[in-house]
């Protein structure tokens, strides 16, 4: 079976007339075939106490995602988005249009110095993975007043 990613012929607004003239078509085609490169969007913010990573993983269950820290302080978010299969086993379904990707994904982030990699925590809620990497407490310099003689 061949899946065509173009629009409905009866709807002229959904047809991409410039598809053949697209200079980035090869790159887009590669991105469609390699979801690991394109489909995991991650935000990284720094708070006074932690680095917080938020990843959109729609359709991924908690048991399909993995969070690891490699030696050298590299945070790895990986997993696999399962392909929707024929659930009743009759195989009488026919796909007309497929845009949602499936397959393995992985994102890697080098953590900065001072990240407490032994205290990383992760949670998932409604397809959003949140990874919190606490920061080492910065010691405020203690000032000692020196009397000036003379």
Curated annotation (Swiss-Prot):
One of its GO terms (cellular component) is cytoplasm. Keywords: Cytoplasm, Stress response. GO terms for biological process: protein complex oligomerization; protein folding; response to heat; response to hydrogen peroxide; response to salt stress. GO terms for molecular function: unfolded protein binding. Induction: By heat shock. It comes from the Eukaryota. Belongs to the small heat shock protein (HSP20) family. This is 16.6 kDa heat shock protein.
């Amino acid at each position: 079976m061949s899946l065509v990613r173009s629009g409905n012929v009866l709807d002229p607004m959904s047809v991409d007339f410039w598809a053949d003239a697209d200079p980035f078509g090869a790159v887009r085609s590669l991105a469609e075939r390699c979801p690991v490169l394109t489909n995991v969007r991650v935000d990284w913010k720094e708070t006074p106490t932690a680095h917080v990573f938020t990843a959109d993983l729609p359709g991924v269950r908690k048991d399909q995602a993995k969070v690891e820290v490699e030696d050298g302080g590299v945070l790895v978010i990986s997993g696999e988005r399962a392909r929707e299969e024929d659930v009743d086993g009759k195989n009488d379904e026919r796909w007309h249009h497929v845009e949602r990707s499936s397959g393995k994904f992985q994102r890697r982030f080098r953590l900065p110095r001072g990240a407490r990699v032994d205290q990383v925590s992760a949670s998932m809620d409604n397809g959003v993975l949140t990874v919190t990497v606490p920061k080492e407490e910065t010691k405020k310099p203690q000032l000692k007043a020196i009397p000036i003689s003379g």
